[in-house]
């Protein structure tokens, strides 16, 4: 599996749009896990071994850190029995504390890379998941501006002005912070 992840990391590094998004997230949140590449780096992957994974499992996979949810036609008593059967032996452990919300870093950075196209990412503070009133408004705004082929960005920048083949907006909402961005 390590070699598969190594190949994925190399593929991302060779995909200008993915690289631009990773660099953008790192600029926005340089000192926070949200600013790190999801796959990690070749260096972080090389430093993971069985001992690290087992330690992580022991710390994180505890009863205090797990929520079991079920929806649909389910017998409550049967669900409780199954939950106890498969998860009852987990140690209680201590609930992990969430990291504080990262500060939004407003910066510009230009990176030169020999490619056929230019990649641009820009963004602003978005809406967090815990902001129930504004998260739905943000979803509608994002869909209107850049959420598909009929969006304003695609119609104006791609179709009318022929300035980019691909352009879209996105909203990444986390528990206590959000990021709204445009990428082309």
Question: Predicted segment positions?
Answer:
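Charge-rich, well-structured scaffold segments of protease-associated domains
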Residues: 1-94, 110, 159-184
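His/Glu-based metal-binding/catalytic segments typifying zinc-dependent metallopeptidases
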Residues: 95-151
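Short acidic/glycine-rich loop or secondary-structure boundary segments that cap or lie
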Residues: 130-132, 152, 165, 176-177
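Generic hydrophobic alpha-helical scaffold/packing signal
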Residues: 142-145, 154, 158, 183
